[in-house]
């Protein structure tokens, strides 16, 4: 027999789950040689070309944890109760789809001074699928709402955005494109 719990998961269990996702992502990046200890500032500040600094793998893991946990919780706070996060998610995914496409082509990446990431163009399909799912969600979320996103949707979307920017090595782009998430989290 299933019992109903009105409280859901505690915040401690949610953070532990997010740390598990961070560990899985780090192991995947490490195993496939995608780890890049170079944090690039050139997309955030295009005036200073080749502005970056190196960090150790342990600090990179801590940085990844901050990006993934911070992003997923900021998106969750932006969501509120009625799917308010869907509009910003569509905008951020569209922006990331363009940047991901550009990082997947060596000529564009070199011309725009971006890190070239082999086969990152495949993630464009994933980001466009998130856009399509979000538009479909909006259709059923208008009054009277038939579908609610909840923590499951908003935490997942925030984590997925973080993982995409980590894979394309543009971690500092997320605060720029998702500025609304930061403002909402700080309010």
Predicted regions and their residues:
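RNA/tRNA-interacting regions in translation and RNA-turnover enzymes
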Residues: 77, 81-85
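Non-catalytic accessory segments adjacent to catalytic cores
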Residues: 20-24
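Membrane-water interface regions at transmembrane-helix termini and the short interhelical loops
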Residues: 1-2, 71-78
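Membrane-interfacial loop-to-helix junctions in multi-pass inner-membrane proteins
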Residues: 2-17
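Catalytic tyrosine of NAD(P)H-dependent dehydrogenase/reductases that use a Tyr as the general acid/base
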Residues: 14, 75, 147
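Alpha-helical transmembrane segments
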Residues: 25-46, 59, 63-64, 68-72, ...
């Amino acid at each position: 027999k299933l019992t109903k719990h009105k409280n859901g998961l505690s915040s401690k269990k949610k953070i532990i789950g997010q740390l598990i996702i961070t560990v899985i992502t780090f192991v995947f990046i490490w195993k496939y040689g995608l780890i890049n200890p170079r944090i690039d500032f050139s997309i955030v500040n295009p005036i200073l070309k080749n502005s970056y600094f190196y960090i150790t793998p342990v600090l990179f893991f801590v940085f990844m944890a901050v990006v993934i946990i911070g992003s997923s919780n900021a998106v969750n706070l932006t969501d509120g109760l009625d799917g308010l996060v869907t509009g910003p998610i569509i905008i951020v995914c569209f922006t990331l789809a363009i940047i991901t496409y550009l990082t997947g082509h060596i000529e564009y990446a070199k011309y725009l001074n971006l890190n070239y990431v082999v086969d990152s163009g495949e993630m464009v399909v994933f980001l466009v699928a998130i856009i399509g799912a979000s538009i479909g969600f909006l259709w059923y979320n208008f009054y009277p709402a038939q579908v609610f996103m909840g923590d499951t949707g908003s935490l997942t979307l925030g984590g997925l955005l973080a993982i995409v920017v980590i894979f394309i090595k543009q971690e500092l782009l997320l605060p720029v494109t998702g500025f609304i998430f930061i403002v909402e989290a700080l309010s």
